[in-house]
């Protein structure tokens, strides 16, 4: 025996009326929102250009913008490793960072261990970290590379 869709609709409607007409009991819901520490950076590569041995860069073109994308503010730390090209190297401390666009000699030397920059990025905001580089006098020619880590501490 086939039941028409009108009868099924009436049956469902009747059940809803019966359920809606019954007793009610309040339910309390709760949720715990976790701390979420997250950020993004505007640039994942810094190109210091071509430099002569014994020279250094300006900061203005070597800026990383950090945007907080979590629900906590971020305190930014940074570290790095030595510059390398084939068997040639020079020190991590030749890279310097600053919270402002300053001269090379005014920056703080990058190290191999995480250092607190005192740069704070509040929730949903941005802040910048500027980098400079000084090439040692007499450094062998080549295209050197270095890894710089930007770390968020919430």
Please state what every model-predicted region is.
Residues 26, 54-57, 107-112, 128-130:
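A short linear-motif detector with a strong N-terminal bias
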Residues 12-55, 62, 67, 79-87, ...:
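Short, polar/proline-rich extracytoplasmic segments that appear immediately after membrane translocation
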Residues 101-125:
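Extracellular adhesion/glycan-binding regions together with long Ser/Thr-
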Residues 130-137:
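Short, hydrophobic beta-strand segments
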Residues 71-76:
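Short acidic/proline- and small/hydrophobic-mixed sequence motifs that coincide with surface turns
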Residues 4-14:
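Bacterial N-terminal signal peptides
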């Amino acid at each position: 025996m086939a039941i028409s869709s009108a009868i099924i609709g009436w049956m469902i409607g009747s059940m809803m009326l019966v359920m809606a007409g019954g007793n009610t009991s309040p339910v309390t819901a709760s949720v715990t929102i976790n701390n979420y520490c997250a950020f993004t950076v505007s640039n994942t590569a810094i190109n210091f250009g071509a430099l002569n041995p014994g020279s250094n860069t300006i900061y203005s073109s070597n800026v990383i913008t950090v945007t907080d994308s979590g629900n906590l503010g971020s305190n930014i730390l940074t570290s790095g490793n030595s510059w390398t090209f084939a068997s040639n190297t020079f020190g991590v401390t030749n890279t310097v960072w600053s919270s402002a666009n300053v001269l090379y000699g005014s920056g703080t030397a990058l190290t191999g261990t995480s250092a607190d920059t005192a740069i704070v990025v509040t929730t949903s905001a941005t802040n910048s970290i500027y980098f400079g580089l000084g090439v040692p006098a007499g450094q062998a020619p080549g295209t050197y590379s270095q890894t710089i880590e930007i770390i968020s501490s919430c």
